Amino acid sequence: MRIAVVTQKIVRHDGQGRVNAVVVEEFLRRGHEVVAIATEVADELARHPSLRWMPVDGGGVPTQLARDQLFAWRASRALARARRAGIDRVVVNGFVSWARSDVNAVHFVHSAWMRSPTHPVRKSLSPLSLYRALYTLLNVGFERWSFRRAGRLVAVSRTVAEELRRDGIDPARLAVIDNGVDVAEFQPGKPDPTLFGLPPGRPVALFVGDARSDRKNLDGVLRALAEVPDLSLAVVGDKRGGPFPALARSLGVEERVRFLGHRRDVAALMQAADLFVFPTRYEPFGLVLLEAAASGLPVVTTRLAGASWLLEDGAAVVLDDPDAQDALVAAMRRLAADPEERRRMGEAGRRIAERHDWPVTAGRYVDLLEAMGPLASGVGLSGTLVRSTS
C-alpha cells in the first residue's frame, strides 16, 4: 500500500513524534510506501527509498492557534496533490488537516482538558489563561470535525478511548492501541547524580515534561521536595518563561534542583536517576512513564495519566488526586529512603515495559490499516468523495 501520514513531526526526540516515527518505520519494514506530510522527519526516515517527504511549514505566524491552522491548510493542499498521484490509505493525528482520513490517531482530547478542574482558566482569568481557554475550545470543535471525517479512530490509551466515548464517538469506530517503548534504548543503568550536576549522597528524582505550565504538576513536585530533604530533583523540559526556577528559589530547594532544559539524551538521564516522579493533572498517555519503567525506575504518578494503569502491578505509586500533597510527599519520602523498594519496583516496571515494545504497538497500526476496506475514509483512490460505510 501507499500510505500518507499527516502530522507535524516524525522524529524520535518528541513524544507524539516518536509514536509517528516507529509506526512509519513499521510501515516501511512491511514493504509499504509512505508519503510523509510533515514539518519535520527524522533523517534516517527521510533518506529511506520508500518514503517521500512533502514538507509543510506551519511557522511564520505569531500564535500556536494560527500556526496550527496554517499547517492544516497547507497539509490539506499537500494531501490533495498526493492523492492525485495515488494514495491507498491516509493516517492523521488529531486535527492536522481539513481532509478526510482512514485512521485518526488520537493523542489528546481537548474537550477532556477543557472539562478538567485543573485547566488554567479555572485558576485565573489572566490574558494568558483566557487565550489558553480559547485555544482549547476552538480545538474541541476542530477535533470533533476531524473525527467525524475519519473512518476509524485509534485511541492511544483507555483514558483517551473513554474520553472519546463521552464525546459521542461510536465505540464501533474506536480501537485502542496503547503506546509503547523502545526497550533497547531505555534500559536500567547505575545511578549517577553527577550526570545532573548534583552532588553525591542523595538519590535523584527525575521529572520529564513541560516545565512552563502546571498541567504536569511540577509545582507539586517542588513543594513536596521541600518536605523531603534527603532527595534531589532533576527537571528535563523547556523552562523558558516558566515560573518553576523562581518557585524552587522561594521554597529554598534550588541547591537540590537542576533544570536541564530540553534534552535528547533522556535515556541516559533515566539510567542515572533513582526514581521518576510525574504526578500529572492530565495526561492522555505519558510515554515518559513507560520509558522510566523500561529504565528500571520506580514511578510516582496519578490516575490522570493514561499509562498509569499499565504500571499498577507493583511498578508505580499511583495517586488518586494529583493535588493531594501529603500523599505525594509520602510517596517521594518512602522511595527516597528505601533502595530495596526502588529495586523491586524498578524490576517490575522493566518486566511490564518489555511487554509493550514498540514493534508490537506499531504492528497493530499496520494490521488495522491492512484489514480495512478500500473506501474506509470515504475517499476513493482517485480522491473522489464517496459515502462512508463506517
Question: Predicted regions: what is each one?
Answer:
Residues 17-22, 203, 207, 212-227, ...:
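A conserved mid-protein helix/loop that constitutes part of the nucleotide-sugar donor-binding site
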Residues 101-144, 184:
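Acceptor-binding helix/loop patch of EC 2.4 sugar-transfer enzymes
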Residues 144-176, 181-185:
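A short, active-site helix/loop in glycosyltransferases that binds the activated sugar's phosphate group
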Residues 203, 341-355:
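A short, well-ordered alpha-helix in the C-terminal region of glycosyltransferases
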Residues 208-211, 232-245:
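Glycosyltransferase donor-sugar binding loop
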Residues 262, 281:
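Aromatic "clamp/platform" in nucleotide-sugar-dependent glycosyltransferases that forms part
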Residues 298-301:
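Short hydrophobic beta-strand element within catalytic cores of glycosyltransferases
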